[in-house]
Regions:
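Long, contiguous binding/interaction regions
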Residues: 1-47, 53-171
Length: 171
């Protein structure tokens, strides 16, 4: 059964790591839904968070292959239930529509979003939340024909237990 899995990999901060890791997804024909790479709490160690829909069998094989990459220190996969996940999204709406429609203000309040910039041409609204919440707010703005631009971050995660404690033990 296909479902969303989130792979968290810790690697040494070396040139080419992103390419080596994503190449394994490409070889297995797995579409990456979300990708975030950042410094971990340990200097010189990068944290990759990769979200994709696949089967458990495929993700097991992929993680085994990821463990064979030289600079990969630790790699595990998780379901959404095991993690605290958030994304950030920015929605651009023309100022004229914003001024003339009370709908935008209602949507901003309803989705617990916030206005981060207003000028004569446009209004930028920021929403932090789950992928589902961000998609639902986007869908509502699109249905009302209010949205002119949209962008989102990759998934940011924290494990409900301490993943980095395990990492420290592996160093």
């Amino acid at each position: 059964m296909t479902k969303e899995y989130i792979v968290i990999a810790f690697t040494e901060n070396q040139i080419g790591e992103l390419n080596r890791i994503t190449a394994l997804y490409l070889r297995r024909k797995i579409n990456i839904e979300s990708l975030k790479v950042s410094e971990s709490s340990i200097r010189g160690i990068s944290m990759f968070v990769i979200s994709a829909f696949t089967t458990r069998e495929t993700i097991d094989k992929l993680v085994k292959q990821l463990r064979n990459i030289i600079d990969v220190i630790q790699v595990e996969y998780y379901s959404n239930e095991e993690l605290i996940t958030q994304e950030i999204a920015l929605y651009k709406i023309t100022s004229k529509i914003f001024r003339e429609s009370g709908t935008v203000d209602r949507i901003v309040r309803e989705w617990n979003a916030r206005i981060i910039e207003m000028n004569p041409q446009y209004v930028v609204v920021e929403k932090t939340g789950t992928r589902e919440d961000i998609d639902a707010m986007r869908s509502e703005l699109e249905q009302q024909q209010l949205l002119t631009e949209f962008t989102r971050s990759g998934t940011v995660v924290l494990h409900r237990d301490s993943v980095e404690d395990k990492l420290q033990a592996n160093l």
